[in-house]
Amino acid sequence: MESQQLHQNPRSLHGSAYASVTSKEVPSNQDPLAVSASNLPEFDRDSTKVNSQQETTPGTSAVPENHHHVSPQPASVPPPQNGQYQQHGMMTPNKAMASNWAHYQQPSMMTCSHYQTSPAYYQPDPHYPLPQYIPPLSTSSPDPIDSQNQHSEVPQAETKVRNNVLPPHTLTSEENFSTWVKFYIRFLKNSNLGDIIPNDQGEIKRQMTYEEHAYIYNTFQAFAPFHLLPTWVKQILEINYADILTVLCKSVSKMQTNNQELKDWIALANLEYDGSTSADTFEITVSTIIQRLKENNINVSDRLACQLILKGLSGDFKYLRNQYRTKTNMKLSQLFAEIQLIYDENKIMNLNKPSQYKQHSEYKNVSRTSPNTTNTKVTTRNYQRTNSSKPRAAKAHNIATSSKFSRVNNDHINESTVSSQYLSDDNELSLGQQQKESKPTHTIDSNDELPDHLLIDSGASQTLVRSAHYLHHATPNSEINIVDAQKQDIPINAIGNLHFNFQNGTKTSIKALHTPNIAYDLLSLSELANQNITACFTRNTLERSDGTVLAPIVKHGDFYWLSKKYLIPSHISKLTINNVNKSKSVNKYPYPLIHRMLGHANFRSIQKSLKKNAVTYLKESDIEWSNASTYQCPDCLIGKSTKHRHVKGSRLKYQESYEPFQYLHTDIFGPVHHLPKSAPSYFISFTDEKTRFQWVYPLHDRREESILNVFTSILAFIKNQFNARVLVIQMDRGSEYTNKTLHKFFTNRGITACYTTTADSRAHGVAERLNRTLLNDCRTLLHCSGLPNHLWFSAVEFSTIIRNSLVSPKNDKSARQHAGLAGLDITTILPFGQPVIVNNHNPDSKIHPRGIPGYALHPSRNSYGYIIYLPSLKKTVDTTNYVILQDKQSKLDQFNYDTLTFDDDLNRLTAHNQSFIEQNETEQSYDQNTESDHDYQSEIEINSDPLVNDFSSQSINPLQLDKEPVQKVRAPKEVDADISEYNILPSPVRSRTPHIINKESTEMGGTVESDTTSPRHSSTFTARNQKRPGSPNDMIDLTSQDRVNYGLENIKTTRLGGTEEPYIQRNSDTNIKYRTTNSTPSIDDRSSNSESTTPIISIETKAVCDNTPSIDTDPPEYRSSDHATPNIMPDKSSKNVTADSILDDLPLPDLTHQSPTDTSDVSKDIPHIHSRQTNSSLGGMDDSNVLTTTKSKKRSLEDNETEIEVSRDTWNNKNMRSLEPPRSKKRINLIAAIKGVKSIKPVRTTLRYDEAITYNKDNKEKDRYVEAYHKEISQLLKMNTWDTNKYYDRNDIDPKKVINSMFIFNKKRDGTHKARFVARGDIQHPDTYDSDMQSNTVHHYALMTSLSIALDNDYYITQLDISSAYLYADIKEELYIRPPPHLGLNDKLLRLRKSLYGLKQSGANWYETIKSYLINCCDMQEVRGWSCVFKNSQVTICLFVDDMILFSKDLNANKKIITTLKKQYDTKIINLGESDNEIQYDILGLEIKYQRSKYMKLGMEKSLTEKLPKLNVPLNPKGKKLRAPGQPGHYIDQDELEIDEDEYKEKVHEMQKLIGLASYVGYKFRFDLLYYINTLAQHILFPSRQVLDMTYELIQFMWDTRDKQLIWHKNKPTKPDNKLVAISDASYGNQPYYKSQIGNIFLLNGKVIGGKSTKASLTCTSTTEAEIHAVSEAIPLLNNLSHLVQELNKKPIIKGLLTDSRSTISIIKSTNEEKFRNRFFGTKAMRLRDEVSGNNLYVYYIETKKNIADVMTKPLPIKTFKLLTNKWIH
């Protein structure tokens, strides 16, 4: 019935079977089916029969009779259903409209049946049937418009067969399927599809396109009716209707199996063997083929097998062809034995020295030579064969002499050859063999030798003997070179004659050579022929030309031999020629062998060791030393390769032709480690080739920007000062010189960059020697003066000045004289480190000292002054106001110079300079720790501020204090070695703002306690307004009580609002308390950091400063030593909740017990590195921002530990800004840029189609992306993403409803490659979606809360993934999308049916879909207020788009949910989580290690290890690791940033990329980095060098700590409640515009689950207000988390809030509402009170030292940072 339908309805047979794709035709020899399908003429016996059926006579159709090719039926006839094909849909639309098959793609020409659902397939027109010839895919088709007329008008007879492809015949029966497949495969190959047909292993050369897939599918079903297919084919098609390639693959495999006989014959006929594989392997291969044929009842005779084998022999084995050429009784075993013998011989030869070899020449194909010095023809006589094998003349090596061979005894020995010839018959022996170069025989084995006989060699041109016993008239060899047939040298020791005495008394003599390096003594027939002697091998005799028999010859083995009894001995007992002994023929060891045995030692070492008997059982005479000295071992050349020796003085001669300052040498030295950040770590030096003038410049880094600035400076200097132009600069190949920036700089200025060759730094000797000289001088100067190491560059600069002024030994002038400069004025030079006294012309008091000790460094670059180091102030100054200190060579000397004083000489030398001293000083300009004394004078203010210590009153009016002179403790004479650990840049002028000291708050607060310290608020971790260690005011003697009490009478406090409080009278009771920590003042500088005798003053007062409302003093119970404020809870259960219960199990730092008198402040910082114009950044404030300051105590160096070695220096715009004017500048204002930052723009991490596939040079990656591409297309079709029944014209659709589409590609974290077809939702019209719909995902806090609860309750955690989740959600709007690009349908549109990725509404649609399913089918409920968190009585689900995390006490409950999900969605189990051991998860980017009932570790080490190196940030993987993400005291320059437009965009993009990744990591689990991330994120639009440096430092810290994890441990099971705690902190006014930074950390049962650091939205006017703002930000989230915890776990919950602000706690507790200073503050405080009381919230005080939220609000010193974080992240 089906065949009848096919016969009646031809339209259904073709359809779109002819979809076209232009493709290269693959040659048949490259086809994977070359043997199995198309290239075997005997492949199928039925092929001739089928071909004959298709032959036609001329003028008739060449198409075979086919039931499919019949007259068309009316259009009303329904399309047929061709068997089972009709059950399935077809592929996606193809590119046929624009292809060569366009004339079959017209709507009236294409078939459209039920199984062809794609719009690409159409019905043929009833009046115009399909052509009988199918054009190949590469054939150009006619114009689609005129296709109908062409088909109707062109007769079939006129069709050109050469331009068409003959279609296969129709399958007629199931038995003929294998035959039909052969023709079908040929048909596809003729259609240029041969490279996509699989071979029998299923391998293909390339992936087919969808058009080609459609073409194969349709042609297969057109010519192979389903009911005639074999059963196995039907089974494949029922599983996958379009898997035609599997059918072809299995068909080919079956054909291969059925035709194994043919394969074996082909393999046997094509045998080849050249010795590259072992003979055994070859024998096994051949035997296996013959045995397989024998099993198929096909016997292969030995003769036939030998003939086939001999035909394929080559190389050394080709000789066997001649041996077996005439044999009729060849045995296969004998042939294999011969092959094995030759193989073994070659193997032995390859292991020995080339000059030694074994004479098995019957298996060697070597060239033969005979002399041509005589016309005597050498012939052979007939002989009788002694056995079945043909005897042959001995084939020895082809011995030839060189052209330098000298004549001996007036007989000249020449090299000659004879023409090659084959043996003509069995009775003729040729003197030559077929000429063929082969490998030499190196063995000296002579098992086949006949003792005391000479081997008669028909091919040797010379006679060679191994013993000199028979050699007459022997002379040493000097010029003779002998080579064998393989062109290998044979060393010759001596030359002489052999004298023969034959039977009849005939005597003759022939020339002979002596060498011990042959296997046999060779008698040359050519030499005998010269004496008219021939060999008769039939009678085995030597005869004269007249027939006289001279001697018999003996056949031994395969060779003929002559006895040595006919030789006349030379009667020489011992021959001394070349140490050859007659007693024995020495077989010496080849030198290469000994060289390898002795570990590739050199020639001289081996020879000397043998002479000294260092190696036993081996003598020097046992080794062949010829050519040993010139032997080149390949392994030694590779393994011992070294760079060439640099030739001294090899600089190019043309360098001398340059004028001064035209040719420069430059080099960089560094880094110098363990220095302060302000000190340079590198220097770059320049030397002029002509004058040898030298320059040095300090550098803090080696970045290309820094180097470029230096080059700009020196070129400008040379141009302006010397009127010269630099033409050439010679450098090494360091990256700082070879970068594109510097190369472009040189090119633009016409400067030639001359680089050294690779790994030849010695060629850069001028610059290298200068650096070495300068460093030698530096070490010497520092050692002599005793100055600290951070002044190393001052020593280098001093040395440069001196070296430029002195005459070098090779020159007659100094560099200065060569440059045309005057000589050095010695009166302007002081010894390096010379002690001086610097005048302080602006002291604070007239009675204070006017001089400060210092040490002279070098003359100033920018003034007539001198650079002098002041140890007491830890800085250098540029001044002329100094006096040389008499009788002291150096205050820092470690040596005794009592007898070496130079005071008189110095006075005499500097007398002229003394009169020049004035009071005008200038500031040193280059970036080294120097300032003019105008700057430091403001620092020398002895007791300029009122005497206030760390715990004085809240506000002290300095007008009420009378100044009293205090003795100043000077700095020690010797500078401590640890001074290099300090940050030595000076602070600017201090603010005259009165000090307002409060241990908690400097503006507003409640009670004051003398027993507590609050160092947090000491000027927001900047020391700009603090006294630094070592400053004069820190050394004030405070031993007198009267002196302390003086000035404390009648002190009145002043509020910022202008009102004054009553005077605080002097109180003799408890108002003032004194505590003495140490009664003995310390003289040591380091110990001076601790207090000597310091009164601790606590003033209790009801007055509240800073406009805070008046609050009653805390009752006595609140002033307990534990510093805990009672809870503010009205709940009756509050009596069971204590501060200890709240603080219990929190990861707070463990502090060592401190005595009540310990007032050290762990949060103070060392002096900061500042720039002149600053704004707040990482914890610092500008002077204009400072409202109040706090005078802090000094602390020990270990508390002030800072990062010095690795952290980067801040950017200095003055010195490091490029002098070259850019093309266009963009002015960036800091504040405007910060305001412009709305959010961190995500950086694109995906690839476009052209990046992933079209232009991807990584073929392996490209193939994976192509595979992912096809997989995505299949999934889209499977999910019915769009309507495949109809294409819509682009012009007929409203443009608002049209959505652009694109492919994006990316590589997932597990290494898989992903392709996704997405809509361009970013340009989607607002009318096409509901803006109220939201795409919800699980909040990170919800996930962390769920993980924490899972750990505490031993839950199983299961991870699932739903494939193509969005495509399960229908779309309601009428939207159209452009087809995928590979279809080429640019003017067509598809109607969307599913929520394609990228649409605005896709996320919301999917959320509603999965939410409905979870609620209705899985009995889940969504937790109120927490989207995407679902739960029922047993299971909790966290949903993030297509990722699901299941939590349950019972694993079976999770499995039940999975089963339900699989009914509707393609659900994949990523991790079931059933193991009791540690399980590793990758959940939303978090790498989690979880062991139930024990612990959970959260990190991102793998991800960071992969991603951070790709950021192009200069990481330092082997250097010292950073120990903190940033340092206190860093400031961002607030000057407007001038930058090129392109460079600005590039740097903004870089900042977005870096901060984007840092934010992702920080908010996942690295909460300790959030402050730095938030601060730097505000400067994304202000990418100055300083901002980038700070960002790089953050990335470096992330790299150094990438292995850190957030550690959780299971909560104690005895605790019945869940404890949720928020820890709050604020840093007042440390952000731009005086904004405060606030931070909160949230903990559940002692586990940190989240953190937040942000800038306060409103400007706070006091510290307390900032703290209130921080607390008010934490409470809402704390309440929401509380609700979530109660929903997920039904235990009771305790909520706690911890803050280190007592003022905030007092405001929350107080009921006084009258003195709130403004409405906003009052409403904020009132709301805070209501939230605390209404939510059962316990508020407690936490010490600042333990407040881990401190890391969220400010940068901290390393020790403090570690102390606060090491408990919860490590």
Swiss-Prot record:
Name the positions where Mg(2+) 2 binds: D1361, D1442, D1443
Q: Where is this region: Integrase-type zinc finger-like?
A: 579-636
Gene Ontology CC annotations of this record: cytoplasm; nucleus
According to its UniProt record, which residues of this chain constitute the active site? D457
Query: Residue numbers for the site described as Cleavage?
Result: H397, N398, N578, N579, A1232, A1233
Q: Where is the composition biased (Low complexity)?
A: 369-382
Q: Which residues make up the binding site for Mg(2+) 1?
A: D667, D732
RNase H Ty1/copia-type domain residues: 1625-1767
Its main localization is: cytoplasm
Tell me its EC number(s), please.
3.4.23.-, 2.7.7.49, 2.7.7.7, 3.1.26.4
Domain annotation Integrase catalytic: ranges: 656-831
Q: Name one GO molecular function term.
A: RNA-DNA hybrid ribonuclease activity
What is the stated purpose of this protein?
Capsid protein (CA) is the structural component of the virus-like particle (VLP), forming the shell that encapsulates the retrotransposons dimeric RNA genome. The particles are assembled from trimer-clustered units and there are holes in the capsid shells that allow for the diffusion of macromolecules. CA also has nucleocapsid-like chaperone activity, promoting primer tRNA(i)-Met annealing to the multipartite primer-binding site (PBS), dimerization of Ty2 RNA and initiation of reverse transcription.
Subunit (UniProt):
The capsid protein forms a homotrimer, from which the VLPs are assembled. The protease is a homodimer, whose active site consists of two apposed aspartic acid residues.
* Further remarks about this protein from its record: Retrotransposons are mobile genetic entities that are able to replicate via an RNA intermediate and a reverse transcription step. In contrast to retroviruses, retrotransposons are non-infectious, lack an envelope and remain intracellular. Ty2 retrotransposons belong to the copia elements (pseudoviridae).
Q: What is this protein called?
A: Transposon Ty2-C Gag-Pol polyprotein
